[in-house]
């Protein structure tokens, strides 16, 4: 027996079919959701009092409906249709708000809320839009370098997993790059994942670089739409190595050119301003037309003065692109004549010359026994004090370490010379006898006494300085005696004697010998006296000349006066004679 369907059920079924076909409603309403979030769609219908149930459906691309959720107003129960893509993802609230968890791109559909009464069906459509933020763009497949004046692929800017697809923009130093024929070419490509329906967008940039692009940052960005509107994400900056040809060559000298001296090692370094810099060059040495192929450095060892000249380097393939420099190898020669150890006799003449040859003006310093001399030594008559160690030293101040020195060890020899002096002590009880000796090598002194007498003290000797020293004894002779002083060195033996009266007999004392220092003082005083005398003589001579000129003029004047007086007297005598004749 067939079941009977009530008239009200038949009416509801007809209304649902007609609602599915006619799709009346309140108009379009859009819900934006982020990928992976929960989509919340309010029903947007006022719930009628005689509501029987509510349903949600979505429409396929061909317009056919697919029911997904049902809620009864009387039984307060919820039922979800067996739709695989929405299994365990749906939630229908009491106010008929539908929530879809874990939003997917496939959820981007037209959903419809349906409220059904016994006599009517009310619909409210909702359009769902799902957005997926893309990954941060990155520049991949980067060119290891870019060459000037060549259109070359710089790299790819890629942004993954976006929905809808984004738009990529390239920037140079923060400014947008636009396609320019022959200079900038941009190729855009997008791909969609069949499973996730997400887009991967790629933009390839071909760029013709110039030297102005050195250290310039390149970036890219992706612009996309999200639930709240348009947004942009930027990549990290990338700086590319720019290759460009060498336009200028420079040459450097190590060590610095003004400090090169004989014996140094010179390194020539040639540099090109290209990138990458040239690795090989041609080096040209003075007087050698053929170049030497080498790396960017060329070293000359133990250079001599003949290495002075012009040096040049050039590119291997462009000989006209070259650089040159002038190198001066500083030198310093010193010749001392005589040098080494020289033995001369006292009174001899010894010319000494220190000859300098240098690349620049050199300073010359003379030292004697480590004491600086005011002038170079000159020996017209050698003295014992001239003996010593002489050093001629020269240096170039501008060149560190360039100095030379030669030494002369002068030995002044002489036979012993003796002078004896005596002096009575003011007390009158003793006499001091001194034997002054000159000579080199140092003579040995011996005393002998002839006659009776006694030696009060032992022999006393002075220091041996500049070939001189003395020996003295103190005696108190009771009678006249003769003292003999003997001085002997490798050259000769010299003897001198001195008669000394008894202590009771007064006698004339002989002055001590003048020391070198006192002799110099005496010489200085003598020079001063001679200068004063010469000055006085010159003054007297000038005064005499002046006096002679004065007297000469005076005599000339007196002659004229006497002549006039004589003429007057003669005239007077003639007149007197005339008077006598007349008488």
Curated annotation (Swiss-Prot):
Chain's gene name: Alcam
Main function: Cell adhesion molecule that mediates both heterotypic cell-cell contacts via its interaction with CD6, as well as homotypic cell-cell contacts. Promotes T-cell activation and proliferation via its interactions with CD6. Contributes to the formation and maturation of the immunological synapse via its interactions with CD6. Mediates homotypic interactions with cells that express ALCAM. Mediates attachment of dendritic cells onto endothelial cells via homotypic interaction. Inhibits endothelial cell migration and promotes endothelial tube formation via homotypic interactions.
Lineage: Eukaryota, Metazoa, Chordata, Craniata, Vertebrata
Subunit text: Homodimer. Interacts (via extracellular domain) with CD6 (via extracellular domain). Homodimerization and interaction with CD6 involve the same region and cannot occur simultaneously. The affinity for CD6 is much higher than the affinity for self-association. Interacts (via glycosylated extracellular domain) with LGALS1 and LGALS3. Interaction with LGALS1 or LGALS3 inhibits interaction with CD6.
Stated name of the protein: CD166 antigen
Domain Ig-like V-type: 28-120, 125-234
Domain notes: The CD6 binding site is located in the N-terminal Ig-like domain.
Top-rank taxon, per record: Eukaryota
Maturation and modification: Glycosylated.
